[in-house]
């Protein structure tokens, strides 16, 4: 059984930080998910145009078994530079894979993925640099992260309306926690064109938009400029997982993306999901029970990913010609 929750803190073992550049030709940013003491990592890339870094290291056959942080960032391939800033900050703290005899001789392991938001602030050359990574890392905290048009979600757009950064978490009956941090920036739509409802509203928490609101949403979708996009995210858990299991979690989390966005995984998207497991809590005591418990964790990963997509869209605020969902359909939230 899944229990959704709204805590003041990120689940144990992780910190999240944003750096946002909004205004004066800027509309982009960077988000860092920091794993305290490192975490087992996995990844699944399904979009047709991904922009990633260090994803090969997460394959179960490679030697690296602990990930220090994951960077989610705007700026398309240019934005991968933000990971350099995170590496520099971690190196200064002596955090990373040891490669020498001295404590400071480390290589921080920092996978990254990007969204396409180039030029959305008005200046094509304004995109994240290594400084963005440094500032996002410095801002990392165990407090529940701000969501909406912040960090990597600052310049996010989906199907003609404003996207954003979202966060959701849940706790399984076993006590294992699962959370997702997602940047919703899709070529597809997050809105059911017939009803005007958000695909991700699986619990029917929101009211149905009025006829004028549905028309406004349909117009925004029809006028949307089709361009490169990408939805990216990190599933976090305090469960003890192997690298193979972490990769499976990342793969199944894409089911949540598919529930929230239609179509998804297009040739215009670079959809990428990471999984980080802090290995603080066992999912079950024996192998048979562990398989059933792991299945529950997989289902939870998909659910929280969809919920984080919903959160990112609802928390977003309009920028320029991109109105937010709640601006176009204010009655849905009362």
Segments from the language model and where they lie:
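Active-site-surrounding "flap" and adjacent substrate/cofactor-binding loops of secreted or lumenal enzymes
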Residues: 87
């Amino acid at each position: 059984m899944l229990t959704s929750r709204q805590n003041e803190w990120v689940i144990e073992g992780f910190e999240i930080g944003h750096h946002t550049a909004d205004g004066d030709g800027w509309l982009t940013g960077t988000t860092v998910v920091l794993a305290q003491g490192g975490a087992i990592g996995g990844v699944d890339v399904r979009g047709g145009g991904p922009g990633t870094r260090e994803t090969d290291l997460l394959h179960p056959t490679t030697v690296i078994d602990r990930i220090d942080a994951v960077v989610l960032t705007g700026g398309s391939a240019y934005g991968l530079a933000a990971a350099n800033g995170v590496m520099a900050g971690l190196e200064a703290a002596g955090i990373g894979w040891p490669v020498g005899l001295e404590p400071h001789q480390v290589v921080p392991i920092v996978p990254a993925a990007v969204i396409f938001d180039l030029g959305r602030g008005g200046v094509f050359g304004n995109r994240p640099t290594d400084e963005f990574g440094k500032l996002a890392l410095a801002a990392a905290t165990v407090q529940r992260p701000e969501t909406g048009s912040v960090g990597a979600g600052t310049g996010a757009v989906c199907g003609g309306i404003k996207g954003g950064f979202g966060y959701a978490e849940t706790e399984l009956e076993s006590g294992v926690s699962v959370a997702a941090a997602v940047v919703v920036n899709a070529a597809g739509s997050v809105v059911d064109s017939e009803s005007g409802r958000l695909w991700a509203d699986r619990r029917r928490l929101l009211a149905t938009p009025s006829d004028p609101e549905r028309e406004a949403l349909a117009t925004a979708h029809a006028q949307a400029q089709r361009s490169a996009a990408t939805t990216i995210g990190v599933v976090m858990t305090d469960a003890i997982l192997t690298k193979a299991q972490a990769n499976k979690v990342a793969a199944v989390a894409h089911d949540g993306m598919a529930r929230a966005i239609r179509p998804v995984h297009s040739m215009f998207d670079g959809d990428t999901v990471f999984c980080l497991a802090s290995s603080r809590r066992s999912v079950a005591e024996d192998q048979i029970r562990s398989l059933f418990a792991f299945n529950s964790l997989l289902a939870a990963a998909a659910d929280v990913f969809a919920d984080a997509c919903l959160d990112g869209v609802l928390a977003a605020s309009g920028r320029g010609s991109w109105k937010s969902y709640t601006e176009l359909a204010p009655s849905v939230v009362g």
